[in-house]
Structures are given as structure tokens and as C-alpha cells.
């Protein structure tokens, strides 16, 4: 997967959402991936923010539009608009706060209620640098991810550990499902998506499982 590109020239535009409790590090994951920055004093997001980054996947240029919102209940009203058009999600918990992991199930249900059932989801245990404060063993995250057929990674936005890999894996899975469906539909493999359009990943329950997903 290639690095940063300045040009606003792409073949695919994928919307990816960050979900999970407030304070788990969603905004820092976003800024680390899109700007390679980390802010120790970042405050809770108010409303919705999004940032973009363009990468190459299998020779195609993919633009990721990544949305971040606060986890507090008072922002629930924006739910529908936030999820609309999303084809990927990072479901984030804090490995040092057990309650954030216990709330993952509620977040996943909400995600499924507002998106296509075949959305690509990565379960992310963030703040892996704080090993001395660990409250959620890696095996707990892996087990839940396997149970729900999700990808899984532990990350550290502070140390930039696995952040690139987590986003890249989600975008790669979305792209491969999308391109597979294009081939099956008899479309030209070089067909590009007009700017401003989202690729919808629909009706392909088995595709992600066939392709395989990360579990490290």
C-alpha cells in the first residue's frame, strides 16, 4: 500500500466511520493516519469531523473519507447522517478501560442498524502502549472479533503502532469486495468511479470471509 498523495485524483472513494466510546482515541487514530500527528491534549470531538487520505490498493487509487464523532450520548441525533454511505468502520475500544470493551456490542448493533449488513468492520483495541494498565487481554478482543466475523488489531495512536495497517486492511477489503463484484457483473476492470460517488458494498455476505481478514 503506497503512502501519501497530494493529487486529488482517485479511482474509488470509500467512506469509513470511527465508532466507540468517548476517550478511546478515535480522533488521534484519525490524525495519526491522515496527518501522522498525535495530540496528547486532544479534547473530545464535538459534532462530526472528517479527514481524507489517498492510497494505492492493488494498483488503484483509493481515497478514504474517514469520519469521526464524539461517543457521548448527547450526539446520538446525528447517527443516521453519520453512518449514511459508510462501507467500512473501525470499532474502537481502550485496552485500559474494560467498560469501553463491554460497550463494543452496543456500538456494533447500532452500526448494523444504520448500514449495509456487509460493511467491513475492524475491531480496534487502542492504547496498546499502556501495557502496564491493561484491562482487556488481547485474547478477549480476538475472541469477540472471531465471534462476530470482524477483523481485529491492537493499535497505539501515540506510538503509531498498527494504525496504518488497521486502516489499510479495511480499505483493501472494501476494494477487493468491490472489484470482485465489478468482475462478476461483467464490468470493465479498469472502470473508475466518478468523484463524489460512494461505492456501496451490498449483498455479498461470504465475500469478506472468503478473502480472509487480519487477526493479529
UniProtKB/Swiss-Prot annotation:
Question: What subcellular compartments does it reside in?
Answer: Cell membrane
Entry-linked CDD domains: Rab11_like
Keywords assigned by UniProt? Cell membrane, GTP-binding, Lipoprotein, Membrane, Nucleotide-binding, Prenylation, Protein transport, Transport
Look up keyword Nucleotide-binding and say if it applies.
Answer: yes
What positions does the entry give for GTP binding?
20-27, 68-72, 126-129, 156-157
Which Pfam families would you find in this protein's record? Answer: Ras
Lipid-bearing positions (S-geranylgeranyl cysteine)? 213-214
The UniProt GO MF terms for this protein read:
GTP binding; GTPase activity
Provide a GO biological process annotation.
regulation of vesicle-mediated transport
Q: Which PROSITE patterns match?
A: RAB (PS51419)
UniProt xrefs under SUPFAM superfamilies:
P-loop containing nucleoside triphosphate hydrolases
Main subcellular location? membrane
InterPro entries assigned: P-loop_NTPase, Rab_GTPases_membrane_traffic, Small_GTP-bd, Small_GTPase
Query: What function does this protein fulfil?
Result: Intracellular vesicle trafficking and protein transport.
> What family name appears in the similarity comment?
Belongs to the small GTPase superfamily. Rab family.
Q: Please report the name of this protein according to its UniProt entry.
A: Ras-related protein RABA1b
The organism of origin for this protein:
Arabidopsis thaliana
Amino acid at each position: 500500500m503506497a503512502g501519501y498523495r497530494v493529487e486529488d485524483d482517485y479511482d474509488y472513494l470509500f467512506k469509513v466511520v470511527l465508532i466507540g466510546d468517548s476517550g478511546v482515541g478515535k480522533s488521534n487514530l484519525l490524525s495519526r493516519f491522515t496527518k501522522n500527528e498525535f495530540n496528547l491534549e486532544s479534547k473530545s470531538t464535538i459534532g462530526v469531523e472528517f479527514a481524507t487520505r489517498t492510497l494505492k490498493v492493488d494498483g488503484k487509487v483509493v481515497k478514504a473519507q474517514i469520519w469521526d464523532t464524539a461517543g457521548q450520548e448527547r450526539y446520538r441525533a446525528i447517527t443516521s447522517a453519520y453512518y449514511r454511505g459508510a462501507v467500512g468502520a473501525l470499532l474502537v475500544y481502550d485496552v485500559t478501560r474494560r467498560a469501553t470493551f463491554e460497550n463494543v456490542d452496543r456500538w456494533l448493533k447500532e452500526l448494523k442498524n444504520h448500514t449495509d449488513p456487509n460493511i467491513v468492520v475492524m475491531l480496534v483495541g487502542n492504547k496498546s502502549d499502556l501495557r502496564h494498565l491493561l484491562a482487556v487481554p488481547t485474547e478477549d478482543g480476538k475472541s469477540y472479533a472471531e465471534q462476530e466475523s470482524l477483523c481485529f488489531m491492537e493499535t497505539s495512536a501515540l506510538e503509531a503502532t498498527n494504525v496504518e495497517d488497521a486502516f489499510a486492511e479495511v480499505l483493501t477489503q472494501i476494494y477487493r469486495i468491490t472489484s470482485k463484484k465489478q468482475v462478476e457483473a461483467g464490468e470493465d476492470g479498469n472502470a473508475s468511479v466518478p468523484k463524489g460517488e460512494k461505492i456501496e458494498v451490498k449483498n455479498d455476505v461470504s465475500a469478506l470471509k472468503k478473502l480472509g481478514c487480519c487477526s493479529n
